[in-house]
Amino acid sequence: MGVAAVFTAVQSDLGALVSEASNSRSADIDLMTTAQILACMNAEDRKIADAVAAELPAIAQTVDRIVAAIGRGGRLIYIGAGTSGRLGVLDASECPPTFSVPPGMVVGLIAGGDTALRTSVEAAEDDEATGAEDVKAIGLTTKDVVIGIAVSGRTPFVMGAIDYARRIGAFTAALTCNPGSPMADLADIAISPVVGPEVVTGSTRLKSGTAQKMILNMLSTASMIRLGKTWGNRMVDVTISNRKLADRATAMLRDATGCSADDARTLLDQSNGSVKLAILMQITGCDADAARANLEAENGFLRKAIERAEKTPPQS
């Protein structure tokens, strides 16, 4: 579908969307007790994981494209409005401390800019030209992947960004909660979990927002695992930026290698706070320079670097 036709489709009846329908199970929610309200919400929330599971093939395809993009020097770009935009910014902001990636590798853009993170800027989502301008302003290239996030699947700001990304040749995905949406037609791939009507009609920050958060978790986490940012399930690329993370790094190093707390702290000091380097040094007996060389030779994959170091005799 061409972009003009897609934008025309956005004018269709909002009430026809799954996410805007009335939920019969919560029709009398204003008459319920507190316990009944919570039970109703909890029962609806139980449906979210199954809805996400149905989209795993599309999520997997998107992860593979993200991994390939970052591997060739590209970026993962999230863009959305309102709650959807905030969730994208949240996921992007967690990647540098969790996986030690550069801040610009995973980018979150929200309609209305940073002000919209704390204060709603509702009208900002209606301008498709601004969506295109925002991704253009960050120097979007064909190497990048753009994930447009909008529950309705028809937010003009997000559609403008997706349209621009496609026109320059960047890979695009639409994360919506309405299958067959205009955004789904516009993007290269659609991820559309059907969570059903909300307990408060149209309040898509509820089930829909939770589904989006789960999927964003998958997109970033699975991509980083594929890029060698973990060793097993250990978060070995964590950035030590506070006392809690320093304690976590020490505990991780002790658990991974069996060394003492004092040895762990010494290794982390010698490795300049790199858990990966410290583990490699302790397991293989390499010094920091040799460990770093082995990691670089294996593109940061610790498991492969350990195997490489163990096959390489230490230099006298």
Curated annotation (Swiss-Prot):
InterPro entries: Etherase_MurQ (IPR005488), Glucokinase_regulatory_CS (IPR005486), MURQ/GCKR (IPR040190), SIS_dom (IPR001347), SIS_dom_sf (IPR046348)
Enzyme Commission designation: 4.2.1.126
Enzymatic reactions: N-acetyl-D-muramate 6-phosphate + H2O = N-acetyl-D-glucosamine 6-phosphate + (R)-lactate
Single GO biological process annotation from the record: peptidoglycan turnover
Pathway given in the UniProt record: Amino-sugar metabolism; 1,6-anhydro-N-acetylmuramate degradation; Amino-sugar metabolism; N-acetylmuramate degradation; Cell wall biogenesis; peptidoglycan recycling
Residues annotated as the enzyme's active site: 94, 125
Keyword terms of this UniProt record: Carbohydrate metabolism, Lyase
Disulfide bonds: none
Function: Specifically catalyzes the cleavage of the D-lactyl ether substituent of MurNAc 6-phosphate, producing GlcNAc 6-phosphate and D-lactate. Together with AnmK, is also required for the utilization of anhydro-N-acetylmuramic acid (anhMurNAc) either imported from the medium or derived from its own cell wall murein, and thus plays a role in cell wall recycling.
Similarity comment: Belongs to the GCKR-like family. MurNAc-6-P etherase subfamily.
Record text on subunit structure and interactions: Homodimer.
UniProt name for this protein: N-acetylmuramic acid 6-phosphate etherase
Source species: Jannaschia sp. (strain CCS1)
The organism's taxonomic lineage, starting at the top: Bacteria, Pseudomonadati, Pseudomonadota, Alphaproteobacteria, Rhodobacterales
Gene name of this polypeptide: murQ
